[in-house]
């Protein structure tokens, strides 16, 4: 019978983007990675989807850069992270949590662009195999958020991988037999490698950044936090009515508390302007102006200027923001008034 004590969770990919105006390669290497800058070798290097043309690398730890990009990109693959844990973090009694906490607590102008988090099942009889879950998917008895897309790669001989959600989605789940993968890679029989089923969550862009942020805020270990996220997002069922959760998946997730990641939406242009006016612009002057007017402390020409504020017209971009706000609050009746007060270009 599968037991939770034979599960472990590790990061299998971490990719972080740093703004050039706030960071230097030396600072990334020495203050964030806790490494010696002289260990890194400079070489040519490129990264898909970006215009980097150079890299600094130490083993598989890589920092990409280039004159056409305004950032540096730290990429740590599974091999790089295994090396980093064994050779840098563990000898210094540090963890990946402390490494990331140092980054989030002490720095700004960076973003996590991708993380892969693996849950490894080393049970002699695993909670499930990729093929078992594939049969559930083929019957359309699963849902991942709002998606029911799945795909597979390989077979049971070389190792089968089950993918949930599309390749271009910001999050994806992979379930595969790590033992078969390693046996194939090493050219040895699988009987020489322990049983090993890997469930791997891949998050990109804002989802990756906010997942790490919420995990650091919590007091939950990576295994249970990741299981909690999967409990909230991914469901398998043993019946076509979606009324009976698949027992093996439920047991795998155990008593983990469901985790929901809320991504803050960027402020609209109107919100940014109002915030700037209040805290960095002329908000205090407007308040003073009103105080002087209400208490009859203005000269006549100043009164005329104050009253003229009500007759000012909106620049087109500001008017556009006002119309969007009126629609948001279901006050479409105000749109004609806004349009009547748009400043016309000469």
Residue ranges and their predicted role:
Residues 1-268, 276-346:
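Structured, helix-rich domain cores that form ligand/interaction pockets
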Residues 273:
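Residues in the recognition helix of alpha-helical DNA-binding motifs
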């Amino acid at each position: 019978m599968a037991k939770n004590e034979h599960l472990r969770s590790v990061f299998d990919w971490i990719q972080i983007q740093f703004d050039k105006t706030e960071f230097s390669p030396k600072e990334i290497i020495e203050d964030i990675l806790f490494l010696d800058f002289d260990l890194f070798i400079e070489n040519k290097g490129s990264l898909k989807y970006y215009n980097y043309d150079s890299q600094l690398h130490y083993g598989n730890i890589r920092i990409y850069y280039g004159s056409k990009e305004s950032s540096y990109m730290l990429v740590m693959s599974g091999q790089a992270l295994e090396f980093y844990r064994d050779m840098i973090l563990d000898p210094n009694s540090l963890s990946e949590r402390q490494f990331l906490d140092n980054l989030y607590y002490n720095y700004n102008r960076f973003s996590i662009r991708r993380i892969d988090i693996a849950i490894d099942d080393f049970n002699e009889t695993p909670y499930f195999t990729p093929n078992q879950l594939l049969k559930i998917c083929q019957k359309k008895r699963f849902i991942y958020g709002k998606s029911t897309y799945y795909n597979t790669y390989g077979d049971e001989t070389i190792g089968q991988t089950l993918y949930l959600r599309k390749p271009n989605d910001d999050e994806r789940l992979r379930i595969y037999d790590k033992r078969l993968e390693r046996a194939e890679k090493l050219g040895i029989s699988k009987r020489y490698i322990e049983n090993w089923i890997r469930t791997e969550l891949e998050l990109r862009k804002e989802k990756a950044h906010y997942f790490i942020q919420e995990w650091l805020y919590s007091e939950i270990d990576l295994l249970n936090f990741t299981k909690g996220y999967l409990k909230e997002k991914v469901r398998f069922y043993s019946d076509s009515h979606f009324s009976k959760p698949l027992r093996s998946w439920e047991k795998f997730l155990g008593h983990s508390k469901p985790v929901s990641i809320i991504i803050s939406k960027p402020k609209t242009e109107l919100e940014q302007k109002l915030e700037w006016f209040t805290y960095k612009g002329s908000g205090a002057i407007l308040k003073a102006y009103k105080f002087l007017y209400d208490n009859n402390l203005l000269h006549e020409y100043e009164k005329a200027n104050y009253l003229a504020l009500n007759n000012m017209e909106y620049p087109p971009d500001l008017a556009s923001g006002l119309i969007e706000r009126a629609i948001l609050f279901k006050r479409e009746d105000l749109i004609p008034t806004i349009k009547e007060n748009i400043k016309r270009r000469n």
